[in-house]
Amino acid sequence: MDSKDHRNELNRFFKSFVHAGRGIWETARTERNFQFHAAAACAVLICGFLVELSIIEWMIIFLLIGGMFSLELLNTAIEHTVDLITDKHHPLAKAAKDAAAGAVCVFAVISCIIGLLIFLPKL
């Protein structure tokens, strides 16, 4: 691989981060549920500092926050893809959107339970 090919690969690699950032920003700007989860994450982080979480607890919290944001992004991508494919109400389109929303809901509930297990003993 010559120097020019290496630069092109590196350029494409960095551009992928730009595209990812745009996707995150657009979702954060337009999706109400993502905004709710961002506010909840801020509240959890503040509470974590106040109760002085251990390093393991911080790791768990960051995994849960990252997982929640990731699932919200995937849910949004699925919703947009379904909307692009059809503007008609179709049972399969509804099933795809509902399943994606269900995945977010399951992770949110489990995250809340784990959060309670971490925070309640510290109160």
Curated annotation (Swiss-Prot):
Statement: the UniProt record of this protein carries the keyword Glycosyltransferase: no
Major enzyme class: transferase
Induction: Mainly expressed during the vegetative phase of growth.
Lipid metabolism is among the record's keywords: yes
GO biological process, one term: phospholipid biosynthetic process
Residue ranges of the TM segments: 34-51, 58-74, 100-120
Knockout or disruption consequences: Cells lacking this gene exhibit an abnormal cortex structure in mutant endospores 6 hours after the onset of sporulation, an indication of cortex degeneration. In addition, they display a significant decrease in the dipicolinic acid content of mutant spores.
UniProt main location, coarse: membrane
Gene3D superfamilies xref list: 1.10.287.3610
Subcellular location: Cell membrane
Cytoplasmic membrane side: 1-33, 75-99
Keywords assigned: ATP-binding, Cell membrane, Kinase, Lipid biosynthesis, Lipid metabolism, Membrane, Nucleotide-binding, Phospholipid biosynthesis, Phospholipid metabolism, Sporulation, Transferase, Transmembrane, Transmembrane helix
Substrates-to-products reaction catalysed: di-trans,octa-cis-undecaprenol + ATP = di-trans,octa-cis-undecaprenyl phosphate + ADP + H(+)
Extracellular side: 52-57, 121-123
Gene Ontology MF: a single term: di-trans, poly-cis-undecaprenol kinase activity
Entry EC number(s): 2.7.1.66
GO cellular component terms listed in the entry, alphabetical order: plasma membrane
Topological category with respect to the lipid bilayer: Multi-pass membrane protein
Family: Belongs to the bacterial diacylglycerol kinase family.
Described purpose of this protein according to its UniProt entry: Catalyzes the phosphorylation of undecaprenol in vitro, which is probably the physiological substrate. Exhibits no detectable activity against other substrates such as monoacylglycerol, ceramide, or diacylglycerol (DAG). Appears indispensable for the maintenance of spore stability and viability in B.subtilis.
Protein name (database record): Undecaprenol kinase
Organism lineage string: Bacteria, Bacillati, Bacillota, Bacilli, Bacillales
Gene label: dgkA
